[in-house]
A protein has these predicted regions:
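Signal peptide-proximal N-terminal region
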Residues: 54-66
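Short, high-confidence coil segments that cap the C-terminus of an alpha-helix
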Residues: 62, 84-85, 186
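Short, glycine-/small- and polar/acidic-enriched structural segments
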Residues: 109-118
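Soluble periplasmic/extracytoplasmic beta-strand elements of cell-envelope proteins
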Residues: 38-40, 66-68, 87-89, 98, ...
Length: 256
C-alpha cells in the first residue's frame, strides 16, 4: 500500500511539472507579456505627448503607449461609449467635468499645463490681418466648433472684444483649423499658441490682448475601468512631474 501511495504521489508530481512546462514554465511570463497603454489626449497635445510616450516606453520594457488625439469633447464621448482608455488629458476643465460627472475617472484630475489662443495666418499674411477686429472683415475665417475647448475659448475672446465673427467653417479640433490655414483654404484661423509654434514657417502668428481672457487649463486623469491603472498613474506622474513640465514648455505650453 505504501508503494502504491508513493507511486501515486510521484505521478502527481510529474503531472504538475509537465503542466508547468506546458504553460510556459515560469510565473514571470505574464508580467513579461506586451502591454498597451491607451492614452486619449487633446489634439493640441500631440507633439509633447508623443515625446513623453517615447520616454515612457524606454523606461518600461514591453509597454507600448498608444495615443488617440482628437477634440476633447469627441474623446469624452468615445470613453462614455465604452472605448478602452487608460488615461485622459483634456484641453479644458469643462470636458474633464463631463468625464467626472459620469463617474468615469479613476483618480482626481490634476491640472498640468495651460494654453492661450493666437491668430494664425498663411505665410505672407495675404489677407493683411493685424488684430482680432480684422477677423470680422471680408476674409475666410476658420475656428473651432463651440463644444471643442478652442471653440469655447474663441467665443470668450469674441465676447470680450465685443466682436461677432462669421467663420466659413467650424472644426472639431484645433489641428483641423491649423490645417486649413496652412493649406491656404483659410485666410485666418484661431488656434493655440502651441499650434502656431509647431507649424513653423508655414504660418505667421498674431497675438491679441483678449487672449488672456480665455486661458485654457489642461487636466489629466486615469480612467475608471482601466486595464492598466498602475501604468496609467505612472504616465500621469510623468506628465505632471518635472520632466513633463520641461517637455511641455519646450512646445510653448504654460505652467498650470
Amino acid at each position: 500500500m505504501k508503494t502504491l501511495l508513493r507511486s501515486a504521489a510521484a505521478a502527481a508530481a510529474i503531472a504538475l511539472t509537465a503542466a508547468a512546462c506546458g504553460s510556459g514554465g515560469s510565473a514571470e511570463d505574464p508580467a513579461a507579456a506586451p502591454v498597451t497603454l491607451r492614452v486619449f489626449a487633446a489634439a493640441s497635445l500631440q507633439e509633447p505627448f508623443e515625446e513623453l510616450g517615447q520616454q515612457f516606453e524606454s523606461e518600461h520594457e514591453d509597454v507600448t503607449v498608444e495615443f488617440s488625439f482628437a477634440g476633447s469633447s469627441t474623446l469624452v464621448e468615445q470613453i462614455q461609449q465604452g472605448a478602452p482608455a487608460d488615461v485622459f488629458a483634456s484641453a479644458d476643465t469643462k470636458n474633464m467635468d463631463k468625464l467626472t460627472d459620469a463617474g468615469l475617472e479613476e483618480t482626481d484630475p490634476v491640472d498640468f499645463t495651460t494654453n492661450t489662443l493666437r491668430i494664425a495666418v498663411p505665410a505672407g499674411n495675404p489677407a493683411g490681418v493685424t488684430d482680432l477686429a480684422s477677423l470680422t472683415g471680408d476674409l475666410n475665417l476658420v475656428v473651432c466648433a463651440p463644444e471643442v475647448p478652442c471653440g469655447a475659448a474663441t467665443e470668450t475672446v469674441e465676447e470680450a472684444a465685443g466682436l461677432e465673427f462669421a467663420p466659413v467653417s467650424e472644426e472639431q479640433s484645433v489641428t483641423d483649423v491649423l490645417n486649413k490655414v496652412t493649406s491656404g483654404e483659410a485666410d485666418a484661423g484661431l488656434v493655440y499658441v502651441t499650434d502656431v509654434e509647431k507649424a513653423g514657417d508655414a504660418v505667421e502668428g498674431i497675438d491679441f490682448p483678449e487672449a488672456q481672457e480665455a486661458v485654457n487649463t489642461y487636466p489629466i486623469t486615469t480612467v475608471d475601468g482601466s486595464a492598466n491603472p498602475q501604468l496609467g498613474q505612472e504616465f500621469v506622474d510623468l506628465v505632471t512631474g518635472e520632466e513633463g513640465h520641461k517637455v511641455l514648455a519646450g512646445y510653448g505650453f504654460g505652467g498650470a
